[in-house]
Amino acid sequence: MSDKIIHLTDDSFDTDVLKADGAILVDFWAEWCGPCKMIAPILDEIADEYQGKLTVAKLNIDQNPGTAPKYGIRGIPTLLLFKNGEVAATKVGALSKGQLKEFLDANLA
């Protein structure tokens, strides 16, 4: 796992995401979720490739049940792109690296 990925908790979400400057991609995931495990290596690569433009963060919804309902998370993996503390874009489900890069490039422009 990339050392560039931030591991969030319900307690740290406010500071690490909502009060942070710039763009942050938050992956809402769980240990038992197969598609979540499929995109984990892709997120590691994205964290490296987009360093300086984007911060990648992960929130385990089983260990941190308070945050996901605030954002209407119903299925996982769900990726929320935050810009300066506001949700700028959402993607639900596993994506290929190409699809994720298209999503990010379109929303970071």
UniProtKB/Swiss-Prot annotation:
The keyword Electron transport applies. Disulfide bonds join 33-36. The record marks 27 as: Deprotonates C-terminal active site Cys. The record marks 34-35 as: Contributes to redox potential value. Residues 2-109 form the Thioredoxin domain. The modification N6-acetyllysine is found at residue 70. It comes from the Bacteria. The active site is at residues 33, 36. It holds the Pfam family Thioredoxin. The keyword Transcription regulation does not apply. Keywords: Acetylation, Disulfide bond, Electron transport, Host-virus interaction, Redox-active center, Transport. CDD domains: TRX_family. GO terms for biological process: cell redox homeostasis. GO terms for cellular component: cytoplasm; cytosol. GO terms for molecular function: DNA polymerase processivity factor activity; protein-disulfide reductase activity. Belongs to the thioredoxin family. Participates in various redox reactions through the reversible oxidation of its active center dithiol to a disulfide and catalyzes dithiol-disulfide exchange reactions. PANTHER family: GEO12009P1. Monomer. Interacts with bacteriophage T3 DNA polymerase. This is Thioredoxin 1. The gene is trxA.
